[in-house]
Amino acid sequence: MSPKVTKEHKDKRQAEILEAAKTVFKRKGFELTTMKDVVEESGFSRGGVYLYFSSTEEMFRRIIETGLDEGLRKLDKSAEHQSVWASISSYLDELTEGLRDVADTLAPVQFEYLVTAWRNEERRQYLEKRYDLFVERFSRLLQKGIDQGEFQPVQPLATIAKFFLNMNDGIIQNALYFDEEKADVSGLAESAKLYLKTVLQADEK
């Protein structure tokens, strides 16, 4: 009888494999990364990797899901200790700082994955679900601001959430494609704040 593997061990092994996958994705991009690459990077056996993940797509989706969930949970947690507006404003400030070395992040790989989704219906549907999840979660955060008397929005919350996501992605794309001056990440982040402050009629008191 084989020894029982604990959940903690499984979680740890999966996390180690995903870290190896991130390294390869950043080095080679999504399309060119193979399972063999991840196996070699991880140092585990082929069977040891396939036990947890059947493809690089499954790995990348797990990475996307974890990143999105962590980001939204961080926003929610921040809003427990300060106003919703302050939490969103702080997020945009952190985004500006985090994009100084954007080429060394997974952002380029995520855009590569997104660009090819229109040709793959299953992938498009998957991304649509993630999009809907973000809109639902961010709208819920905005509703909390309304309930606390911070906001009096002049557009539907879902529309504001969708536009916020578009602004967020646009800022990241600028940082990827252009030099620091032309990308104007800090200026765009301030413009995003101005839009949100106006459309939400935010009370910063």
From Swiss-Prot:
Q: Does the keyword Electron transport apply?
A: no
The record's listing under PROSITE patterns reads: HTH_TETR_2
Q: Which UniProt keywords apply?
A: DNA-binding, Repressor, Transcription, Transcription regulation
InterPro entries on file: Homeodomain-like_sf, HTH_TetR, Tet_transcr_reg_TetR-rel_C_sf, YfiR_C
Pfam families the UniProt entry points to: TetR_C_17, TetR_N
Is Glycoprotein one of the keywords?
no
DNA-binding region, residue intervals: 34-53
Q: Which residues form the HTH tetR-type domain?
A: 11-71
Coiled-coil annotation reads none
Provide a Gene Ontology MF annotation, just one: DNA-binding transcription factor activity
Q: Name one GO biological process term.
A: regulation of DNA-templated transcription
Name-wise, this protein is Uncharacterized HTH-type transcriptional regulator YfiR
